[in-house]
Design a protein with these regions (language model features):
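Structural core segment of the AMP-binding/adenylate-forming
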Residues: 2-23, 130-203
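Conserved pre-ATP/AMP-binding loop-to-beta segment of ANL
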Residues: 66-69, 190, 196-230, 237, ...
Length: 623
């Protein structure tokens, strides 16, 4: 038995062990069932307090505790932490704001940020907020990976920046050249001062703020556009989504409406953040949440992919977070690491109050392993929360209570209304509320298509109540309306619910799975093996290669899975093991760590063809 098997077995007793208290109110909702079959769901908890703007929030926190560390980042090569305090952040933001105002920038302009998370990136963002100039953080892959810069050009055409910032002039030189061709009047700013014609960020930081900065800050309100975030672009060119201070404030207020206890002013929450600020989770919810809570965030240069997650583990030896949020794939890798390393386990659980995930469903197996580890270290289970939303909506539902159930999307955040609309055999999710954008920037056609006749935004996902007779138990993610497919028999396959169940059934040997079978006679699966599992099989002295051993193991586990599947919509006919890790460059896994089913199937079409070949192609196993 491997250590992972042991952890999962130990977790059988986990339901008898109490959860660590969650500092949030319990579920309380009103459900309205309409004559047309649609269902409206609202929280009975009122929203709490929220800031006027993030610029005002920064000023208030800097005045309250100017010397408290706000953000820390390691020097290159996993060196010592460097930091900026709340007071230093305010002074820097006001200097940058003054520099932008001196250059004539207004709310009709924008500043584009090309590079990944850094202290300098954060200061530029705060400077833009303070000046009332929208900031547009772009996925670094658009500049560094793309050969034609098509998405970079597109994003620039949408927001028409006047200033472009990047951490390194040399690293982003090619992107600068591309953008210069689009607009010869662009001003380039770099943190390292490098780059032909680029202005060092230090020049902006050294600008002395005048009364103009305070005047600009006082014009800010809930209607002010703070930034533009772009959708992932997995099904076309990214769409620019205006993010107002009102949307951000409503998200904070929703969380405050669920707070069950007053924050301890003597406790400074510590967090570790790897997810990119070019997306809603880290860029708005996480970034603003740290400011609101007066916490200290440590920037993590690791990612939940082989070869990079080791950096996250190194950081977790030193940073013991109060809350840890990430993509489901990261929790699987973290469980593997902690099962082998009691020192890491002790550091991770030292201050932890709860964990959170989003963007995909966490498997029951990973949850059980995490809880077994928590019990071994703390004697308690750790609540696992989820928040569900999109670039266009912020977080609109949350699981804010301790529950045995994995896969919930929770219940509406205070102030938000969820509408469930019948769509075939499922309910499509739509949302309205102060956290939702008014539309796409400079794209009225897509804006009109995104909202229904009542003004609800169409999320494109499906959800259902865990218990129709007791909606307070929460809603369950029921797949992407556009991701599900039909077999050639006409039977629907729900990818969003099948995938995590498959991963759990094949634990601890697989990291993730991709499902195929549209218009085919049976479902196929493509698996990524877990690193720990392959290491265990490589150390086994028995006959066969690790891949052959894994194929045999998965064949047995899938045969057992099929016996309880209940029908062709969940039975696996054939599978193949992918020996090449998911590629960020090719879009198979996003910079948030979420697997893109469509991109993976397109890139690995040869493997899909092998699954359905007669006879099966190389490497394909029949269950």
């Amino acid at each position: 038995m491997t250590s992972a098997d042991g952890a999962a077995s130990a977790a059988v007793s986990a339901p008898k062990v109490p959860f660590k208290p969650l500092p949030q109110k319990g579920p309380d909702v009103t459900v309205e069932r309409r004559a047309d079959g649609s269902i409206l769901v609202r929280s009975n908890h009122a929203p709490g307090e929220g800031p006027r703007s993030i610029a005002h929030l920064l000023r208030d926190k800097a005045l309250a505790h100017p010397d408290r560390p706000w953000m820390k980042q390691r020097e290159p090569g996993h060196g010592p932490w460097r930091q900026v305090t709340y007071g230093e952040a305010l002074r820097a933001a006001e200097g940058i704001a003054q520099s932008l105002l001196d250059r004539g920038l207004t709310g009709a302009d924008s500043v584009m940020v090309l590079s990944s998370n850094s202290i300098e990136h954060a200061l530029v963002m705060l400077g833009c907020y303070t000046a009332g100039v929208p900031v547009a953080p772009i996925s670094p892959a658009y500049s560094l990976i793309s050969s034609d810069h098509a998405k970079l050009r597109h994003c620039a055409a949408v927001v028409r920046p006047k200033v472009v910032f990047a951490q390194s002039g040399a690293m982003f030189e090619r992107a600068f050249q591309t953008l210069s061709e689009v607009d010869t009047g662009l001003v380039f700013v770099t943190a390292d001062g490098e780059g032909e014609g680029a202005i060092p960020l230090s020049d902006l930081l050294a600008t002395a703020p005048t009364a103009a900065v305070e005047a600009a800050r006082e014009t800010l309100g809930h209607e002010t556009v703070a930034k533009y975030l772009f959708t992932s672009g997995s099904t076309g060119m990214p769409k620019g989504v205006p993010q107002t201070f009102g949307m951000m404030s409503a998200t904070i207020a929703g969380g405050e409406g669920l707070r069950a206890e007053e924050a301890d002013p003597d406790v400074v929450p510590q967090s570790l953040e790897w997810m990119p600020w070019s997306h809603i989770s880290a860029g708005n919810i996480g970034f603003n949440g740290v400011l609101w809570g007066g916490g200290t965030v440590h920037l993590d240069e690791g990612k939940p992919i082989p070869g990079m997650f080791e950096t996250t583990i190194k950081n977790l030896y030193e940073v013991s977070p109060m809350v840890f949020g990430s993509a489901p794939i990261a929790f699987g890798m973290l469980a593997e690491a902690m099962e082998r390393d009691p020192v890491l386990r002790a550091s991770f659980f030292k201050n932890l109050r709860y964990m959170g995930y989003g963007g995909a469903t966490l498997s029951n197996d990973v949850n059980e392993r995490l809880q077994a580890l928590a019990i071994a270290e703390t004697g308690q289970r750790i609540p696992l929360t989820t928040m569900y939303g999109a670039t266009e909506t912020q977080g609109v539902t949350v699981t804010h209570w301790a529950t045995e159930q994995v896969g919930l999307v929770g219940l509406p955040v205070p102030g938000v209304t969820i509408k469930l609309v019948p769509n075939g055999t499922k309910y499509e999710v739509r949302v309205k509320g102060p956290t939702v954008t008014t539309g796409y920037h400079n794209d009225p056609e897509k804006t009109a298509a995104a909202f229904d006749e009542e003004g609800f935004y169409r999320l494109g996902d499906a959800a259902r109540f865990l218990n129709d007779n007791d909606p307070a138990q929460g809603m369950v993610f029921d797949g992407r309306v556009t991701e599900d497919f039909k077999l050639d028999s006409g039977t629907w396959v729900s990818v969003g619910t099948l995938r995590p169940d498959l991963v759990a059934a094949c634990s601890p040997w697989v990291m993730d799975a991709v499902i195929c079978g549209q218009d085919k006679p049976f479902i196929g699966a493509l698996f990524w093996p877990s690193m720990a599992g392959m290491q265990t099989l490589a150390a086994d002295a028995g006959p066969g290669t690790p891949l052959e051993k894994l194929t045999a193991l998965l064949s047995g586990k899938l045969a057992a899975f099929n016996t309880t599947a209940g029908g062709s919509s969940r039975r696996i006919g054939r599978f193949v093991i992918m020996t090449e890790p998911p590629s960020i460059d090719a879009g198979e896994i996003t910079d948030k760590g979420y697997v893109n089913q469509r991109a993976t199937l397109e890139r690995r079409d040869g493997l899909v063809q092998n699954i359905y070949a007669n006879p099966p192609g190389a490497g394909v196993a029949t269950v």
